[in-house]
Amino acid sequence: MRRTVPRGTLRKIIKKHKPHLRLAANTDLLVHLSFLLFLHRLAEEARTNAFENKSKIIKPEHTIAAAKVILKKSRG
């Protein structure tokens, strides 16, 4: 099984940024899952950008451009 961020550490980080929120027992797992899904979408978009630019390597420019697109879509 893959190692993840310690749950207690993730809960402390969330509480530090939003101390007034009451968190459910599985909130840290949902945040971690959202993070992994974001990374997956970012990697796919960066790969597409690299392919469109006829590059075999994903460069920082591809990742930055992908991040802008993904974050714009995520704002909802």
Curated annotation (Swiss-Prot):
Outcome when changing residue 75 to A: Lethal mitotic defects. Lethal mitotic defects
A Pfam family per the record: CENP-W
Keywords of the record: Cell cycle, Cell division, Centromere, Chromosome, DNA-binding, Kinetochore, Mitosis, Nucleus
Subcellular location: Nucleus; Chromosome, Centromere; Chromosome, Centromere, Kinetochore
Keyword DNA-binding: yes
Gene Ontology MF, one: protein heterodimerization activity
GO terms (BP aspect): cell division; chromosome segregation; kinetochore assembly; mitotic cell cycle
Function noted in UniProt: Component of the CENPA-NAC (nucleosome-associated) complex, a complex that plays a central role in assembly of kinetochore proteins, mitotic progression and chromosome segregation. The CENPA-NAC complex recruits the CENPA-CAD (nucleosome distal) complex and may be involved in incorporation of newly synthesized CENPA into centromeres. Part of a nucleosome-associated complex that binds specifically to histone H3-containing nucleosomes at the centromere, as opposed to nucleosomes containing CENPA.
Protein name: Centromere protein W
Source organism: Gallus gallus
